[in-house]
């Protein structure tokens, strides 16, 4: 079992490395952020051809020395110092040679945009100037993600119901944060909403701890808070190109014991039974619809952890119930060992039923020693 987990982790890593290959990520590190602690994260991203631009404050003139030492160990940082930069919106980028930045990215180097002088964060200027500069750099370069590194990430992540927030959900978030004792997060959330509206696809709030950037980029669970532009969603049939995504989506359910292990070859052989919930081209949920005579089974529900809690599994289940009805089935049924799923299906109108009443061809292939409950809905 441990070997299987290791293989899943390797598959997950390889999957995301390929997905983000040649993407541009801008990482904003305010004064006091542990630049040295993140060097290994930066090196891993760059090693898998993710193009990284670092924007950081260097009030103590330490960055140049850190970068020099890192480059001696094989890193490929390229330092651009913006000395005594005045952070007025119309002047922030006057001293920055974007052609040099773009060229260095094409050469596989990591540009570091560092400055020495800026006004302090205050009531009049509540957003760290590093974040403001990082956002403008991200917009100018067409970055896929803007990472805002800071201490507030851990507090805010524990206060939010999930680790992903869509732009449409940001409208009421400042009031909720103020009411829950986090007024300091309100200006930042307003700033993030503005950057999404301007065209940055993803903004990530992240703690400056070693390994957190790696986890955010290369794992399904992530490590920070992902703020995304509101994107188009749809339900579609699964195809062979989805098999790796489907395997990784099912992994947490398999590891918890909620779903029996499923080989990729088994998924491929039954690919026509599966449906995908997709957001902006990325599979975030799946379920299967299997035929047993006049019965159809809803099976193998899985949702990407940070996309749960928004009714997507319910929407997918209702869609599949209608598919079963349109295909002429008389009944749909589902089984689970998870009490939350029992409630889920009962909410959709399913009623408990003895497993012995289910089709004989289904019973012949099921391990009845599993402590699952069956639920049925007549169409």
Question: Which positions does each model-derived feature cover?
Answer:
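Conserved GNAT acetyl-CoA-binding A-motif
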Residues: 324-337
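Residue-level detector of beta-propeller blades
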Residues: 161-164, 283, 352
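Conserved catalytic-core motifs of GNAT/GCN5-like acyltransferases
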Residues: 333-335, 346, 351-370
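Short hydrophobic/aromatic beta-strand or adjacent loop that forms the aromatic wall/cage
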Residues: 272, 369-376
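A conserved beta-strand-loop-helix scaffold within acyl/acetyltransferase catalytic domains
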Residues: 259-305
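Conserved acetyl-CoA pyrophosphate-binding loop and the N-cap/start of the following alpha-helix
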Residues: 307, 311-319, 329
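C-terminal catalytic "cap/lid" subdomain
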Residues: 1-261, 265-266, 309
């Amino acid at each position: 079992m441990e070997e299987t987990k290791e293989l899943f982790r390797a598959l997950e890593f390889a999957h995301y490395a390929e997905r983000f290959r040649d993407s541009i990520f801008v990482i904003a590190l305010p004064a006091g952020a542990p630049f040295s602690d993140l060097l290994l994260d930066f090196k891993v991203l760059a090693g898998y051809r993710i193009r990284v631009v670092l924007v950081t404050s260097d009030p103590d003139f330490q960055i140049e020395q850190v970068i020099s030492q890192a480059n001696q160990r094989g890193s490929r940082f390229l330092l651009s110092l913006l000395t005594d930069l005045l952070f007025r919106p119309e002047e922030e980028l006057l001293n920055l040679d974007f052609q040099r930045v773009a060229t260095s990215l094409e050469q596989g180097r990591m540009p570091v945009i560092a400055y020495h002088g800026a006004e302090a964060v205050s009531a009049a200027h509540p957003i760290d100037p590093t974040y403001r500069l990082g956002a403008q750099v991200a917009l100018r370069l067409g970055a896929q993600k803007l990472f805002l590194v800071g201490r507030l990430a851990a507090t805010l992540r524990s206060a939010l119901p999930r680790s992903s927030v869509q732009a449409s959900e940001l409208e009421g978030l400042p009031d909720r944060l103020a009411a829950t004792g986090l007024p300091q997060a309100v200006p930042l959330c307003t700033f993030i909403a503005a950057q999404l509206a301007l065209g940055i696809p993803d903004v990530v709030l992240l703690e400056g701890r070693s390994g957190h950037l790696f986890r955010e980029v290369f794992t399904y669970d992530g490590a920070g808070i992902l703020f995304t532009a509101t994107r188009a969603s749809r339900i579609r049939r699964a195809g062979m190109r989805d098999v790796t995504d489907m395997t990784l989506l099912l992994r947490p359910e398999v590891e918890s014991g909620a779903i029996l292990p499923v080989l990729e070859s088994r998924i491929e052989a039954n690919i026509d039974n599966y449906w995908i919930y997709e957001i902006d081209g990325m599979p975030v949920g799946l379920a299967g619809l299997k035929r047993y005579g006049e019965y159809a089974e809803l099976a193998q529900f899985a949702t990407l952890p940070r996309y749960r809690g928004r009714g997507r599994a319910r929407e997918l289940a209702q869609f599949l119930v209608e598919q079963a009805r349109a295909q002429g089935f008389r009944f749909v049924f589902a089984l689970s060992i998870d009490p939350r799923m029992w409630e889920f299906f009962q909410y959709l109108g399913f009623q408990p039923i003895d497993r012995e009443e289910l089709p004989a061809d289904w019973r012949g292939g099921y391990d009845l020693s599993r402590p699952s409950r069956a639920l049925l809905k007549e169409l």
